[in-house]
Amino acid sequence: MNKVFICGSLEPGRDGVGDYSRRLAAALIQRGAQVALLAFNDSYIDGISLTEQVQGEFHIPVLRIGKDESAGKRISEAKKWIDQWDPEWLSLQFVPYAFHKKGLPWRLGKQMRKIGRGRKWHIMFHELWVEAGDARKQIVALLQRAIIKSLVSKLDPLIAHTNLP
């Protein structure tokens, strides 16, 4: 099985979902899978970095794209790298704030569809939306729910999970 996990950032020890993805990738590699990681909106780097990250005894191929890169550049670099890697599965590790500073990644579904056209999708929803509170939070929560529905509609994942009860 050849799989790419896509998350916001992959700075070791600074991004919980990135750390989770790295540990999961290492566990799958240990079982014989080929796995790579893509940080599509990395807050901890400038530019684009093609490297490896180490988890235990495993070296994991990584593409990190800085958050300040244009959407077009992020899409083209990610698509080129994914096409070279040629994974059977793409796994989006979704946290709204990982892909947009205000937690409203409106274009994420369209962007992911462009980089992963014709591939099988899995989505892991680590956080769904902010808890309702004041009027502003209620509006953000409604918008985040709409974004999630759009994301599912655009990617049509074969599998979706959440870690929330």
Q: PLM features: residue spans?
A:
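Nucleotide-activated donor-dependent transferases that construct or modify glycoconjugates
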Residues: 1-14, 90-96
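Hydrophobic anchor at the start of a short beta-strand
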Residues: 3, 34-36, 121
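N-terminal strand-loop element at the rim of the active site
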Residues: 7-8, 12-13, 26-85
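Acceptor-binding helix/loop patch of EC 2.4 sugar-transfer enzymes
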Residues: 119-146
